[in-house]
Amino acid sequence: MSEMVDTTQTTTEKKLTQSDIRGVFLRSNLFQGSWNFERMQALGFCFSMVPAIRRLYPENNEARKQAIRRHLEFFNTQPFVAAPILGVTLALEEQRANGAEIDDGAINGIKVGLMGPLAGVGDPIFWGTVRPVFAALGAGIAMSGSLLGPLLFFILFNLVRLATRYYGVAYGYSKGIDIVKDMGGGFLQKLTEGASILGLFVMGALVNKWTHVNIPLVVSRITDQTGKEHVTTVQTILDQLMPGLVPLLLTFACMWLLRKKVNPLWIIVGFFVIGIAGYACGLLGL
């Protein structure tokens, strides 16, 4: 009598740990460290992926070499919002290491497909809204002579930056390929519009608070029965009509000049010249 013995080959599922994800997050802070004109952020992306590649692919294995080469392809996006792309790539690499039929083209296709739309969101949110608003808050405090101003800007901006990077990687990894659905349906456009509206609202309030323009040209002088003289200036009339009108017009003028591609340095110099000349001629006051 012969005895049949069934043998089954078991393989251990390869799984990224929280330590690996934290390692990717920490390395992503050096994302721009090796930026170059040929492949932009490719080296930074590959450097960030190293902890995951070490976990998923054995040392001195062809699969590890392919993974390294795979992430040296051209990549360029806003550096903070590269985090969810890193997270999605982690999920895809994990599935591939466990035998899923995911080729190089699929992984790079997801990266290329996400880096453009996310760059369109990251630039207006971080460079056009978050940084100017925090800088304005810090500058307002610094104008009073307090060191808290620049410290506040540094702390707030980096809190947002680090939170975006960490939770972006974690979110992208947890969602995997499904993140593409979340990016659809006009979500990115609504997010960008909302951030832009909030930024414009805050900057509008700051313009009225911190921009001071005085036009002391006298319109009339009236002496009352007690002999007290009442002077009406152009600035008095403007404040009665709409407080902060001149600073608002100056802001619109700056926006128009910037859209015409005028160098911001020349705009600043122009304001200096107008202010000095206007004060010398008596058109502007302190």
UniProtKB/Swiss-Prot annotation:
Coiled coil: none annotated. The lineage of its organism: Bacteria, Pseudomonadati, Pseudomonadota, Gammaproteobacteria, Enterobacterales. The phosphoenolpyruvate-dependent sugar phosphotransferase system (sugar PTS), a major carbohydrate active transport system, catalyzes the phosphorylation of incoming sugar substrates concomitantly with their translocation across the cell membrane. The enzyme II ManXYZ PTS system is involved in mannose transport. Residues 144-147, 213-244, 284-286 are periplasmic. The chain crosses the membrane at residues 104-143, 148-176, 187-212, 245-258, 265-283. InterPro entries: GatZ_KbaZ_carbometab, PTS_IID_man. It is found in: Cell inner membrane. This is PTS system mannose-specific EIID component. It comes from Escherichia coli O6:H1 (strain CFT073 / ATCC 700928 / UPEC).
